[in-house]
């Protein structure tokens, strides 16, 4: 099987990028760039963690790094947003967080803030207790980054954890955790919790049309799954 994708609407129809399936990895394709470098493309980017998968995945992560992945799930933030978080971005009195650096671009080892609308929303008290313990034990100051690690290192950690938990590592990227966060909130909202779709869109930094386009149907989760999702998310929005 060979998939062909046009590189540009302005190029001749005969000039196409050819994607070929990666042996033994269903749904993963590879191509060769003009500079000879190989790259991979997933046919389905809408892969969400099921709650049991998420819990098993966390068991395969180094204990000191679990809080990083919990932060990705609790905030639904992009990896760049989460890696720019500092203790001072949290308000412990009401268990809320402000994502200040919402868009950034790295070039030649330098990170440049591009702007974007800041987002301020609540997270669970259970998560906040674990995060505050992490901050105390690491003696992290209010103006220091919570997670002193590169995006590439986190990505590799994710891949290793996913593979160790028995899942297909090529089906997951860091962005899939963000997708999971939004999908889980959509799932509990469908279940009857007083959680407006506009609130979910605000958390994710999406408009309504983008949210509808990029998130699937909550019907993929069973009632048991939804109960576990509520348990994992904690008392965010008084879900429990």
Segments and roles (model prediction):
Residues 105, 204-229:
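Catalytic-site neighborhood detector that most strongly recognizes the C-terminal catalytic loop/helix
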Residues 90-92, 191-216:
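Short, polar N-cap/turn motifs at the start of nucleic acid-interacting alpha helices
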Residues 1-35, 40-41, 224, 228-240:
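C-terminal secondary-structure termini that scaffold catalytic or DNA-interacting sites
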Residues 25-54, 108-125, 140-141:
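DNA breakage-rejoining catalytic core of tyrosine-based enzymes
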Residues 49-79, 189:
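Basic, Lys/Arg- and aromatic-enriched nucleic-acid-binding interface segment
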Residues 38, 125-157, 163:
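Major-groove DNA-contacting interfaces characterized by cationic-aromatic clusters
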Residues 140-144, 156-202:
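Short, basic (Lys/Arg/His-rich) helix/loop patches that form interaction surfaces
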């Amino acid at each position: 099987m060979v998939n062909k994708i046009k590189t540009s609407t302005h190029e001749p129809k005969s000039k196409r990028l050819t994607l070929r399936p990666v042996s033994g990895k269903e749904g993963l394709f590879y191509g060769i760039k003009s500079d000879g470098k190989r790259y991979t493309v997933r046919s389905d980017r809408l892969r969400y963690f099921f709650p049991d998968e998420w819990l098993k995945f966390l068991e395969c992560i180094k204990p000191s790094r679990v809080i990083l992945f919990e932060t990705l799930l609790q905030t639904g933030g992009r990896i760049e947003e989460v890696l720019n978080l500092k203790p001072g971005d949290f308000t412990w009195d009401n268990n809320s967080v402000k994502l200040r650096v919402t868009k950034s671009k790295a070039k030649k080892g330098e990170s440049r803030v591009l702007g974007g609308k800041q987002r301020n929303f609540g997270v669970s008290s259970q998560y906040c207790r674990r995060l505050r313990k992490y901050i105390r034990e690491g003696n992290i100051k209010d103006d220091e980054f919570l997670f002193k690690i590169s995006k590439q290192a986190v990505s590799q950690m994710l891949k290793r954890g996913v593979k160790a938990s028995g899942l297909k590592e090529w089906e997951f990227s860091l962005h899939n955790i963000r997708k999971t966060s939004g999908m889980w909130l959509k799932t509990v909202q469908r279940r009857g919790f007083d959680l407006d779709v506009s609130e979910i869109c605000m958390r994710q930094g999406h408009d309504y049309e983008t949210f509808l386009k990029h998130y699937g149907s909550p019907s993929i989760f069973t009632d048991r799954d939804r109960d576990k999702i509520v348990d994992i998310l904690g008392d965010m929005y008084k879900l429990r």
